[in-house]
Amino acid sequence: MLEFHQIYDPLGNIWLSALVALLPILLFFLSLMVFKLKGYAAAFLSVALSAIIAVLVYKMPVSMVGSSFLYGFLYGLWPIAWIIIAAIFLYKLSVKSGYFEILKESVQSITLDHRILVILIGFCFGSFLEGAIGFGGPIAITAAILVGLGLSPLYSAGLCLIANTAPVAFGAVGIPISAMASAVGVPAILISAMTGKILFFVSLFVPFFIVFLMDGFKGIKETFPAVFIAAFSFAGAQFLSSNYLGPELPGIISALVSLVATALFLKFWQPKVIFRSDGKAASFTKSNHHICKIYVAWSPFVILVLVIVLWIQPFFKALFEKDGLLAFSNFYFEFNNISNHIFKSPPFVESDQSASFPVVFKFFLINTVGTSIFLVALISMLVLRVRVSDAMSVFGETLKEMRYPILTIGLVLSFAYVSNYSGISSTLALALTHTELAFTFFSPLIGWVGVFLTGSDTSSNLLFGSLQQLTAQRLHLPEILTLTANTVGGTLGKMISPQSIAIACAAVGLAGKEGDLFKFTVKYSLIFVAIMGVVISAIAYLIPEVVPAIK
């Protein structure tokens, strides 16, 4: 069997190597923003260029490049595309049944103001879903709901991507932080605590920024009390839970606290001027729907919350472990020609020796978020009284609408894994470590690049965690700070990740318009990560005592 040892400076000059490694990303940017290509075309060109660079510059065997491409494409299909298919199917069932109109009226009974609706659904409810399931599902569900409530598709998708910034670090029950902590050998609570301190200000800022994007400073002034309640309750709960409970629950706790606090506050206060993004006059005629009908209308999303809570319980997860009752539903397919035949080298491994890693495609039929959402959709068919023939028609319609987004997601993940397994992405990160004292400014950018490439804060943390730690040790910086910078920088890259862009466009019916959405979010993402670099530098050199020490 062939072995491949990753080379991080193939051209003998780290900056020249980094320039070559940057070419596929630049091509993706240009394809979307300048040439205005569809998402799948931009992704195909980027993965093709990365494959050529992997073979010709990084000397990766062609067969390994092919296997990396296939592994990434399959991972894009399952579990990621499956999550989005199930989420959109659930939403469409609600619309098909007619009960979504009742749900819409009940939401509008809380407030008719679109600015506050985006905070309640995109920020609060989206954060809860991110804290529980992650993987792009929150963006798909919340963006689709906002379109149903009257916001434009591009607006809904872009605002939900920005709203998703605050909870990503603690997404999927804290896996981004706990996985990195395990990989680098530091207590997860320390990274969680530092992340909570930094994200306190991000979480305070994001809701106000969303309102600003919708209606400028006038909008902030008109909605300040409600937005402040949402932002402060979220940031406060996130800070306390991340510092005292660990990384698993802050995403869920902060979202629920903020959602309840804001909804209760709106019982007693409403903005004097009701803002509608569609320009229509705000009007609401109270319907005489029986309370039971309102409960039925909300039932798909209530059941979704309950099933998600069940899915993350330890006793339920134990059913899928070896010899568990449902272990038969887990399938494993090892890619023999790359599994344990690709070797990472220092500084991406702590030892002085190269280290290989397994490459196994995990096809979990039941123990995956997409299946949990699909199960909710099946239950909702009964509750909403949707006929089987209608449900099958809706599912077929969903698959038809998703065919290009599925292709885009698959190609994006192929690009990610070709870049990761060849060493291309590692070259970019390694170049930034050569900035010496300015490394604190570029440290969040490494996490940002990682999430742009992989679409996942967890993957970015696993990919670059050791590099952040070892560079901090070499430069005598607090390693908890650079590890946190990787996590937080990653959250700021989520809004422009090709995977996230494809998911958001699919959810709101903008497949093929990925360039428009990318153009909407990229400028804010770049500004935010630059500001975060300044914040990390200020902490490192002015107030390092706020960083938890490893004991």
Describe each PLM feature range:
Residues R115-S127, P153-A166, P187-P207, G410-L411, ...:
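Alpha-helical transmembrane segments of multi-pass membrane proteins
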Residues V95-F100, L112-D113, L146-Y155, S182-I189, ...:
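Juxtamembrane helix-boundary/capping and inter-helix hinge elements in multi-pass membrane proteins
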